[in-house]
Curated annotation (Swiss-Prot):
Family the entry assigns: Belongs to the ABC transporter superfamily. Vitamin B12 importer (TC 3.A.1.13.1) family.
Catalytic activity: an R-cob(III)alamin(out) + ATP + H2O = an R-cob(III)alamin(in) + ADP + phosphate + H(+)
InterPro entries in UniProt: AAA+_ATPase, ABC_transporter-like_ATP-bd, ABC_transptr_BtuD, Metal_Ion_Import_ABC, P-loop_NTPase
Protein name: Vitamin B12 import ATP-binding protein BtuD
Keywords assigned by UniProt, alphabetized: ATP-binding, Cell inner membrane, Cell membrane, Membrane, Nucleotide-binding, Translocase, Transport
GO cellular component: ATP-binding cassette (ABC) transporter complex
Gene of this entry: btuD
Main location: membrane
Record-linked CDD domains: ABC_Iron-Siderophores_B12_Hemin (cd03214)
Length: 251
């Protein structure tokens, strides 16, 4: 369980609280500059904050980076490293330090996750030969290996900042299959997202931020209303039903 009490990051993010359960998928949404990345970095223990964040009882503000790495994976928006590395080497570095790379579980997890993300034919490529979407899928695979319950029983949380940003439509579908897999294994997934229709379909809980303030929190149905979204995003939005499913239309 993830418990957050009065989390604040100076004037960038005003106090907010939440409680997230195992297997839940949380989307953090809001206009650019509203505090999404700040919130995720604080939850991951990467920047100073006031208040408290606990991941399965671990006090994030007091934990070392190695302790945090055992309990959560954090994927920020990032460029490729400048040094030379092959995909399989990058994935090997993502495996928990106390797990032998030779064990069958590691090979199985790498195989399953790389196949799911359609990167199994790229394991022997240099990361500098990858497109933006390919590199992002490799990074997603690495973060999942870090907190795979099969390899790391202490893992509880996946934190992703705009994981779909570099992906095309087909690759984005693979991402949401991966999210379903990881949540199904009992991990809590907290991610920033810009595609509100994806949030409407896939999020168990939604945090809507506006100018550093938690404007609304609740289920997708409760938060993604026409009135609320128009107020925060300042644009005309309609919610329609198509083949029995809700969709948001933007002018």
């Amino acid at each position: 369980m993830i418990r957050v009490n009065s989390l604040q990051v100076d004037s960038r993010l005003l106090p907010l609280s939440l409680q997230a359960n195992a297997g839940e998928v949380w989307h953090v949404i809001g206009p650019n500059g509203c505090g999404k990345s700040t919130l995720l970095a604080a939850l991951a223990g990467m920047i100073p904050f006031s208040g408290s964040v606990q991941v399965d009882g671990l006090d994030v503000s007091q934990a070392s980076l190695s302790e945090l790495a055992r309990h959560r994976a954090y994927l920020a928006q990032n460029n490729k490293p400048s040094f030379q590395l092959h995909v399989f080497q990058y994935l090997a570095l993502s495996v928990p330090a106390n797990v032998a790379l030779e064990c069958s579980e590691v090979a199985s997890e790498i195989d399953q996750i790389s196949r799911l993300l359609n990167i199994d034919d790229k394991l022997h490529r240099s990361i500098h030969q990858l497109s933006g979407g390919e590199w992002q899928r490799v990074r997603l695979a690495g973060s999942c290996l870090q907190v795979s319950p099969v390899l790391n029983p202490s893992a509880r949380l996946l934190i992703w900042d705009e994981p779909a940003a570099p992906l095309d439509i087909a690759q984005e579908s693979l991402l949401y299959r991966l999210i379903e897999r990881m949540a199904g294994q009992g991990l809590t997934v907290i991610m920033a997202n810009h595609d509100l229709n994806r949030t409407l379909r896939h999020a168990d809980q939604v945090l809507l931020l506006s100018r550093g303030v938690l404007y609304r929190a609740g289920s997708a149905k409760e938060v993604l209303t026409q009135e609320v979204l128009q107020s925060v995003f300042g644009t005309s939005i309609r919610r329609v039903e198509l083949e029995g499913h809700p969709h948001l239309l933007f002018d």
